[in-house]
Amino acid sequence: MRNKIPTVLETRHMEVRIDRDTFLDGVQKVQGIAETKGTMPILSHLLLAAEQDRISIQATDLEIGSKGYYSANVITAGEMTLNSKKLFDILRELPREEVHLVKEDNHWVRVKCGKSKFRLPGMPPEDFPPFPEFSQDSLMEFSSKLLKEMIRKTFFAQSPDETRQVLNGLLLERENGKLKMVGTDGHRLAVVRRDLGDTSKGEKLSYLIPKKALAELVKLIEDDEATFSFSAKNNHMAFMQGDQVIVSRKIDGKFPNYQQVIPSDNKLQVKINRNTLQQALKRVALLADEKSKMVRFDIQSGSITLTTDTTELGEAREEIAISYSGEGVSVGLNAKYVLDVLNVIDDEEVILNLKDEKSSCLITSNTDKDYQSIVMPMRL
């Protein structure tokens, strides 16, 4: 475990004053990582460490660690731990004034803000797991806006099955100045490619980032113009932005060869207004089988017809006029999977690239040719 803090700090006890909004912001950024129902009580706590003119706020679940630094009036340096959820709940209700923290004997902590006073039990700071070692040497850099967009366009495609660990995250790849992010659950796939510029050319890099780390990473993104640095060391990778860092274990295992899944011979291109398809599909899917979510897509010259027909729920049908003059084709698709894709495409028009009822549907758009999503077909 961690080294015990110096005796001089123990005898004087940590004391800090910090702006309530600053404190709340720091706790909010890491409290999602703290374990609330784990077998190690210390993991439900945050580690607060004060030195010089700042305080660090740290959380971990042993797989992911997050730490941020915030300006504070440090009267006495030291460390303390407090229950993450209780601290967050208290800070959220406090007035927007200065918060005064004082550590007492046996790890108790007094919290004062305005007329409000609390006395909270802590745990020994030395029991808190050490923060994972990570490299400060950046392997690549990208804007917050780029990172947020790439996660948004692929996050939904990850597998919810915890036993398929290699699919419980996203693949981050850098090759020839391009950054790629890929997600798949075996029934669908989403891949987005973005240009990183000449500065990122170098050896190919490939990392599997866990789902929880990605979700926590998105919480840190406040300024679209800010820059994230990415580094990796041994089994850990780190995302750094300003005074905040998230360190995560890499997922072990081999990600599927996603390039083989992307169809290259889907010659039937059906262009349709994204919002029109989205709204019609939502309506028809109301009567889709609750397990399979299947909707039948019948495409012919001038129209696309969406149909569901189940004995238990009944039938639904909606026809949409389209400017298509190719050969007819029918395919069964999971309505939720298609809607997930439509929710993240920003273009007004989407393209359904089809071949036949036994082949996957490739969904693209004209304005973003570096984003592709594949939905596997279902038996009609």
Spans of model-derived segments:
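Structural preference for solvent-exposed beta-strand-turn elements
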Residues: 1-380
